[in-house]
């Protein structure tokens, strides 16, 4: 995978960090994006010594100019981008205990700016630099499709992100899809599967999933397990 370039937003922890490690371990050049410079430095140290090259880049997906420079940097290093994982996300509140009517306007705005507009910005700014066979993956969860009490505007923002994937799938030549790994233990959830256990799922979707099955659809754990059993 020496000639394979991956851009992961929200790469400093959780799913993003595990996905970055998986691809770097196989020799890909992984460009890791995050807002926290200290966390990026820790990530670089953690991934140092793996087979692939790792580049860390501070960027905020809420800022299209940051993301534009991120994609320019990734492409300048290796020529083009083979995989984009639009993983950056936030949750303001306690999962399962965030009623819509009790959320602040600030939380509403930031959920949408980060979790939905951030996906839009990441895809749009990556397009000029994508390799012909490049893929775009957007992590999500069932809360985006099966609204449950207590997930507030976070659920709304993830539903919006999935709608964006459907829209892009209708217009782009590149395979783009939603990856739903189930409940994963992250800073957002605090409980669930180890991110390292689901990172191979992202690798499979990126490299082995038939492109016709990555046309705006949701690829969940069941699909992955059936395909790899």
Question: For each of these PLM feature ranges, what is it?
Answer:
Residues 26-42:
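Conserved glycine-rich Rossmann-like NAD(P)H-binding loop of the short-chain dehydrogenase/reductase
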Residues 174-181, 190-229:
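C-terminal helical subdomain
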